[in-house]
Structure formats: structure tokens, C-alpha cells
Regions:
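Solvent-exposed interaction patches of small proteins and small membrane subunits
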Residues: 1-150
């Protein structure tokens, strides 16, 4: 691995850490709010920030980090599904099916506008966040063989 690739990986892992930290903050805040029929405007704002942070972290992990790991491992590029399946084989994630669901929810976050559907998204994001965070930790551990950092 070139020094340039190692520096790029370290930079992307820092971005991943920062995004994880802010997602954890929002996860804790929104877990305390919980799922309910009606939200106060401040609660909606918290959940909207949370879902945006969830989508951002999933993009960083799947689109940037998994792609970079594939490049470092000399794997061929492919579809997002291919990338997720390879991540499961490398044990970066526990389940490719869960990460496909994370990707679907990420797309729903970007394109859903109906209030009743948004509440459903809130529940899904709350249940999927621990899996996303686990994927981050597994990936960082895997990447330590390239960076000598955990």
C-alpha cells in the first residue's frame, strides 16, 4: 500500500469517526424521545437531524470506506450490493441483509415526505443504528491492518 493510500484511509476513518460521534449523540437524544403519534416541533427537528446523520454515516461507510477497503484488498468494483456482500465476507458487518435494509432506509430518508411514513422511518432508524455502529467498529478494526491504528 502506498503512503498516499494510507493517508487517504486515515483521513476517511477520521471522517467516519466524526460522523459516528454525532450520530451517537442524536441516537441517544431520539431514543429518549421515543416513537409516538405526535411530536413537538423540537422533537421533530431532533429526529430529522438524526435521520440525516444516519444517512450520512451509512453513505460514508458503504460508499467511501467499503469502496476504499475493496481497493486496498484489490477487489473489483461492482454494485452497492456487491460491496455490501464483500463487507460481510470480510466480517466488516454482521449481516449483508441488514446493510441492504440500511441502504433502503437511507434512500427512504432522502425521498419520503408523508408524515406517517416519516414516523415509520424514525422507528427503523432507531432499530438499525446499533447495526450501523457495529459495522463502523468492525470496519475500523479491519482497517487497522492497513493503518496500525484502532
Amino acid at each position: 500500500m502506498t503512503e498516499q493510500m494510507q493517508l487517504l484511509l486515515l483521513k476517511e476513518l477520521k471522517v467516519l469517526d466524526d460522523a459516528r460521534d454525532i450520530l451517537v449523540y442524536s441516537f441517544n437524544k431520539c431514543s429518549a424521545i421515543g416513537i409516538k403519534e405526535n411530536y413537538e416541533p423540537e422533537e421533530l427537528e431532533s429526529f430529522e437531524s438524526y435521520t440525516g446523520r444516519f444517512a450520512r454515516l451509512s453513505d460514508i461507510l458503504i460508499q467511501k470506506i467499503f469502496r476504499l477497503v475493496d481497493e486496498l484488498d484489490l477487489d473489483t468494483q461492482g454494485t452497492i450490493r456487491d460491496r455490501i456482500n464483500r463487507a460481510e465476507k470480510k466480517e466488516l458487518i454482521a449481516s449483508s441483509d441488514i446493510f441492504v435494509e440500511i441502504r433502503i432506509v437511507r434512500n427512504d430518508i432522502a425521498h419520503e415526505y408523508l408524515p406517517e411514513a416519516i414516523r415509520d422511518i424514525f422507528g427503523k432508524v432507531l432499530s438499525l443504528t446499533p447495526h450501523l455502529l457495529d459495522g463502523v467498529e468492525r470496519t475500523k478494526k479491519y482497517c487497522s491492518k492497513y493503518t496500525n491504528v484502532v
